[in-house]
Regions:
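Core of compact, soluble alpha-helical bundle domains
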Residues: 1-132
Length: 132
């Protein structure tokens, strides 16, 4: 089925709103987002444009989301929580096919971001910003 029939940009925006509702209520993610984001309307529009591009092919987002995350105090466990919040939001709002696609994209993003932000593997198998 074509993505146009699966969802529209309003559905994608509802997905983004639901994600941030979940993430901002999370004990670990909430403080990170609150400290980093000063203009929520602008940020949610950017994130919605990203997902509309990724899931619908809307061509509303260009560039990479990596750079703004470089200075944030993100640790390995945050990725698990971020993925869980996205998964929940997708299941709540998106048609199943798009929810699955969003999670495939999110897992790829998490792996890429983790590789860049946490390049050092500790003896216990976890990843870190700095060598031991």
């Amino acid at each position: 089925m074509s993505t146009e029939r699966l969802a529209d940009e309003a559905t994608i925006f509802a997905f983004v709103q639901r994600f941030y509702q979940i993430a901002r209520a999370d004990d670990e993610l909430g403080p990170l987002f609150e400290a980093a984001i000063t203009d929520w309307d602008r940020h949610m529009a950017i994130f919605a444009n990203f997902w509309a591009t990724a899931l619908l092919g809307a061509k509303k987002y260009e560039g990479t989301g990596y750079a703004p995350h470089i200075g944030l105090p993100i640790e390995e466990h945050h990725f698990t929580r971020w993925l869980a919040a996205l998964d929940c939001a997708g299941k709540d709002v998106l048609p199943p096919e798009l929810a699955e696609r969003s999670m495939a994209r999110a897992r790829h993003m998490a792996m890429s971001f983790k590789t860049g932000l946490l390049p050092f593997k500790r003896a216990d198998g976890t990843w870190s910003r700095t060598p031991e």
